[in-house]
Regions:
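C-terminal catalytic region of ATP-dependent kinase domains
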Residues: 194-322
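Conserved ATP-binding subdomain of kinase catalytic cores across diverse folds
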Residues: 58-157
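Extracytoplasmic/secreted envelope proteins and their assembly/folding machinery
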Residues: 83, 105, 109, 170-173, ...
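Regulatory N- and C-terminal appendages and interdomain linkers associated
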Residues: 7-72, 88-91, 279-322
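Residue-level detector of family-conserved "landmark" positions at structurally sensitive sites
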Residues: 122-123, 187, 296
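N-terminal secretory signal peptides that target proteins for export/translocation
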Residues: 1-4
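Conserved kinase catalytic-core segment
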Residues: 104, 110, 152-225
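Solvent-exposed, acidic/flexible segments
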Residues: 98-105, 162-169, 176, 180, ...
Length: 322
């Protein structure tokens, strides 16, 4: 009996091995990640900074959501804020962001757009009813245009713009607007057909954690950080010191290492772009987000002050022997 049992066990084992080998041999190969083709773009030299409409932003009047006949599609997962995918009366899809980040993100997009950076298209709706979900105030509507493929995130430390002025400038702007949530998952590559063929637009998709404050002291970082808080923003620091021809910025956000090796030349370049925006344009960028007059005064004043700090930077003079 023992001999027969051993024989049966060996046969079963052999059959299992053969089935496993067949399945392995015919297993479908893993789908390779599609290589992105197109021209990478982060910033386009603007010839019209002084005349850009920072109230309507990158989408202009033509892209504004048509709120009659709004329908709910689904809840969007991920991120700090509640978000709903909706369709407007014109059949266009949007992601509606609810909560504190809506205002700050709307203004941040307009500020970047004003300087030539590529951005999402968004608008702030002061009050809207989303069927089945409720009525909300200050809701950011972010466009999901047909033909625009969201082709994954891009990395701050590994991208086609390493060492370029536009990438360094973007870092400086993130410190200027106090964006303390600098992480790769907040970035997106938008693939679309543009005037020059296929474009790969490198965009910061989530700019909600801006115009607030974050401490540079690690133990206080989570306790004191804020977003969309004009008073905190106006009280926070931007510039710390100059070391040789490098600028040390006061930045208490994630990925602080990104703020190392910022040159005076790059900082002045950002300042020169910002200085071309009029007070009216800056006010429009914040008015578009439904800030009060007092809040707009605070925010515009602080952006102006930080712009002047960038423009006034000079190399540190070292006295004594090397």
């Amino acid at each position: 009996m023992n001999h027969k049992r051993k024989l049966v066990t060996l046969i079963v084992f052999a059959l299992l091995l053969s089935v496993t080998s067949i399945e392995t041999g015919f297993a479908k190969p893993k789908k390779k990640k599609e290589a992105l083709t197109g021209t990478p773009i982060m910033w386009e030299r603007p010839n019209d900074i002084a005349s850009r409409d920072l109230y309507l932003g990158p989408g202009g009047a033509a892209m504004r959501p048509y709120l009659r006949g709004l329908t709910f599609i689904k809840e969007e997962k991920g991120g700090w804020s509640k978000k709903y995918r909706v369709r407007d009366g014109a059949g266009r899809e949007w992601v509606a962001k609810i909560g504190k980040e809506a205002q700050s993100e709307t203004s941040a997009v307009r500020l970047l757009y004003g300087l030539g950076y590529l951005t999402e298209i968004n608008y702030l709706v002061p009050r809207v009813t989303i069927p089945g979900k409720g009525t909300f105030t200050n809701v950011r509507f972010e466009a999901r245009p047909e033909g625009w493929k969201r082709a994954g995130e891009w990395k701050w430390k590994s991208n086609p713009f390493a060492g370029t002025q536009e990438l360094q400038g973007l870092k400086i702007l993130m410190a200027l607007i106090n964006n303390w949530d600098l992480k790769d998952s907040n970035n997106v590559i938008l693939k679309l057909r543009g005037n020059r063929g296929d474009e790969l637009r490198y965009v910061i998709s989530d700019l909600g954690a801006t115009f607030g404050h974050a401490s540079t002291t690690p133990i206080l970082w989570r306790l004191t950080r804020s977003r969309n808080n004009p008073v905190n923003y106006a009280k926070s620091n931007f510039f710390e010191k100059v070391k040789g021809d490098r600028v040390v910025l006061h930045f208490g956000g994630k990925n602080r290492g990104l703020m190392k090796d910022i040159s005076i030349h790059d900082a002045q370049w950002v300042g020169s772009l910002l200085s071309q925006l009029s007070d009216r344009q800056l006010r429009d960028a914040f008015r578009a987000a439904n800030y009060s007059t007092g809040q707009i005064d605070l925010l515009v004043g602080e952006v102006r002050e930080r712009t002047n700090e960038l423009l006034s930077l000079r190399p540190a003079v070292q006295i004594g022997r090397n």
